[in-house]
Each structure stands twice: as structure tokens, then as C-alpha cells.
């Protein structure tokens, strides 16, 4: 699950990808070639998203993920400030990657004649939140509060940078098991944040808001709050609240686990059917349930250090 998320760095149609080791950098690049900066390791995964290799940055032995995508498989393009045309996810990652540790960082990228190569940080040891919940069940509220606060901060950071993630879910959140820090990953469904309505969506349907299911229209901020409500329910109950479109449209929340009344109130507020009735990020952070949040290192010491991480996938 973890690698499948790190791998999803562009919208691609399924097709075989060229061998990263066999291709050469496009001529005219001023920076040192990829091959001299990074030691390319084994193939981690491949598919419609491209191919991803493990790697090491030669200068400091930093673990990295090396992503190779073919240009003719990229469906969503953007433009850097200097006018360079790149996959939209490069644009989004460059906007959010500096000065904040709660999102996965794009360390570098290279353009080849027929493809792009993206260099991403590869934290160790980590586990994505989906696998964490699958293995351990519903989270204690103290742990869920710490995790949810960090995700909220990451989403706020993205919005402050003008980026809408559009696929907030447990599979797209990495947990650093040593430090208790979370990272938001996979901006492949993302877009530039705007105040006007969106009429396209390529995220995960069971995390999408009822206004998208019914009308194929939504506003970015209120849709993000809905997804956060689904995520919080998933944390404290061990699974998502809705599986089918009709359940999303009804919006009736039933709690399968014993959950405090304050936590239930926050979840139901985030999952208000009318977008205008949902809380703002500030209102979420000021909610009574969100007080006395553990620091990441406290979270690691209390809840994580006794755990043995499974192998990365």
C-alpha cells in the first residue's frame, strides 16, 4: 500500500514503462545528470503510474524514491514560474515542499526526451495509516487526536500554498514510527486551489462529498472538510462510515465503536450535508475535542515505540 501511494505521482493511463537504467537525460540540462547524483536501486513497483525505484542520494546517502513517468501518459499538465511545462503534480509538490515537514517532499526532478524523473524523499521506517489501522483496529482517541491534528495542519499548509489535495484518505498518510510525525502524500489528484466551483474530481469516491455525488460540483475547502470527517471516523471506528453513493447522500452517521460525545459532534459537523454548515479549519482546531493534543514525539513514545513496523510495501 505504501509504495503504491508514493508511486502515484502523475495521472497516467496504464502502459508499460521504459527501464529507468537504460534511458539517458535530455541534452542541454545544466545540472549534473541523474546517474551521477543518485544510486538507483531495485524496482519498487510499476504499472499505469510509471515505474518507481528505490535509490540513494550519493552526496549524503539519503534514501529516495525515483519515479519515472512517460510524457505521453501524463493527462494533467502545469507550468512552472519560468514557463517550463511539467506534470501538474510537480507544480503542486514544488508549492508545498518547502518549509513544512507534514507533506512528502519533491527533492528534484529531471526531464528526459520522452519522460520525467521525480526524486522524492523516502522516510524510514514508515507505515501508511490504512495499514496501521488495518493491523491495529480503531485508534485510541488520544492517538487519533494527535494524528488528526497533524493531517489538518498539512491540509491547511497546502491551502495556504494554493494547493487542493483532493484525495485525503488513510492510504495517503504516512506515519514515521520513530518520530510520531505524519506526512501527506500522493498529489496526483490535486489541483490549484480556487474559490470558484470544481466540476472534476479524480480522488477516492467514498471520501468525496455528497454535493459531488449528486451534482458533480463542489467547492474545494468544504469538500476537504468532508474528507477530513471521513478520515477522523475511520481513525476512531476502524473503517469508513459510507461505502455506497446513497449512504453518502443520506449522510447518516452510525458509530460502530464507543466514541466520546465530543468526537462524535466534530465528526458529524464535518459531515454536514450542506457544505456551508461544515466547520472551517480554525473551527475544527478550536473544537473542544481538539484540545490537549500530544506532540508528535510524545505520540511516538506513548503509542508507537513499542510497535514493530511491518515491511514496506
Swiss-Prot record:
The membrane spanning regions, by residue number, are none
Q: Which GO terms describe its biological process?
A: apoptotic process; cellular detoxification; cellular response to type II interferon; negative regulation of apoptotic process; negative regulation of DNA-binding transcription factor activity; negative regulation of innate immune response; positive regulation of brown fat cell differentiation; positive regulation of cardiac muscle cell proliferation
Q: Give a GO cellular-component term.
A: nucleoplasm
A Pfam family cross-referenced in the UniProt record is: Pkinase
Q: Which reaction does it catalyse?
A: L-seryl-[protein] + ATP = O-phospho-L-seryl-[protein] + ADP + H(+); L-threonyl-[protein] + ATP = O-phospho-L-threonyl-[protein] + ADP + H(+)
Q: Which UniProt keywords apply?
A: Apoptosis, ATP-binding, Cell cycle, Cell membrane, Cytoplasm, Host-virus interaction, Kinase, Magnesium, Membrane, Metal-binding, Nucleotide-binding, Nucleus, Phosphoprotein, Proto-oncogene, Serine/threonine-protein kinase, Transferase, Ubl conjugation
* Record InterPro entries: Kinase-like_dom_sf, PIM1/2/3, PIM_Ser/Thr_kinase, Prot_kinase_dom, Protein_kinase_ATP_BS, Ser/Thr_kinase_AS
The record's family statement is:
Belongs to the protein kinase superfamily. CAMK Ser/Thr protein kinase family. PIM subfamily.
* Name assigned to this protein: Serine/threonine-protein kinase pim-1
Identify the species of origin.
Answer: Homo sapiens (Human)
Q: Which gene encodes it?
A: PIM1
Amino acid at each position: 500500500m505504501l509504495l503504491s501511494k508514493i508511486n502515484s505521482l502523475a495521472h497516467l493511463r496504464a502502459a508499460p514503462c521504459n527501464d529507468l537504467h537504460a534511458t539517458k537525460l535530455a541534452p542541454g540540462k545544466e545540472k549534473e545528470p541523474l546517474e551521477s547524483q543518485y544510486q538507483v536501486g531495485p524496482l519498487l513497483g510499476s504499472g499505469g503510474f510509471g515505474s518507481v525505484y528505490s535509490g540513494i542520494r550519493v552526496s549524503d546517502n539519503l534514501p529516495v524514491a525515483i519515479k519515472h513517468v512517460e510524457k505521453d501518459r501524463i493527462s494533467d499538465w502545469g507550468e512552472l514560474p519560468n514557463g517550463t511545462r511539467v506534470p501538474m503534480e510537480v507544480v503542486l509538490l514544488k508549492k508545498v515542499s518547502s518549509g513544512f515537514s507534514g507533506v512528502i517532499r519533491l527533492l528534484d526532478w529531471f526531464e528526459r526526451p520522452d519522460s520525467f524523473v521525480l526524486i522524492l524523499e523516502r522516510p524510514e521506517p514508515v507505515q501508511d495509516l490504512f495499514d496501521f489501522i488495518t493491523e491495529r483496529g480503531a485508534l485510541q482517541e488520544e492517538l487519533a487526536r494527535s494524528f488528526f491534528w497533524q493531517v489538518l495542519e498539512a491540509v491547511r499548509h497546502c491551502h495556504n500554498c494554493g494547493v487542493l489535495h483532493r484525495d485525503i484518505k488513510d492510504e495517503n498518510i504516512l506515519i514515521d514510527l520513530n518520530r510520531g510525525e505524519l506526512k501527506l502524500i500522493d498529489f496526483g489528484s490535486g489541483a490549484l486551489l480556487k474559490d470558484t466551483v470544481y466540476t472534476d474530481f479524480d480522488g477516492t469516491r467514498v471520501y468525496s462529498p455528497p454535493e459531488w455525488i449528486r451534482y458533480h460540483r463542489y467547492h474545494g475547502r468544504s469538500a476537504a472538510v468532508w474528507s477530513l470527517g471521513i478520515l477522523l471516523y475511520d481513525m476512531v471506528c476502524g473503517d469508513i462510515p459510507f461505502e455506497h453513493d446513497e449512504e453518502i447522500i443520506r449522510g447518516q452517521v452510525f458509530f460502530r465503536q464507543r466514541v466520546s460525545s465530543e468526537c462524535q459532534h466534530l465528526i458529524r459537523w464535518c459531515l454536514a450535508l450542506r457544505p456551508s454548515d461544515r466547520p472551517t479549519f480554525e473551527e475544527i482546531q478550536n473544537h473542544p475535542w481538539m484540545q490537549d493534543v500530544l506532540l508528535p514525539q510524545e505520540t511516538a513514545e506513548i503509542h508507537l515505540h513499542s510497535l514493530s513496523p511491518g515491511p514496506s510495501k
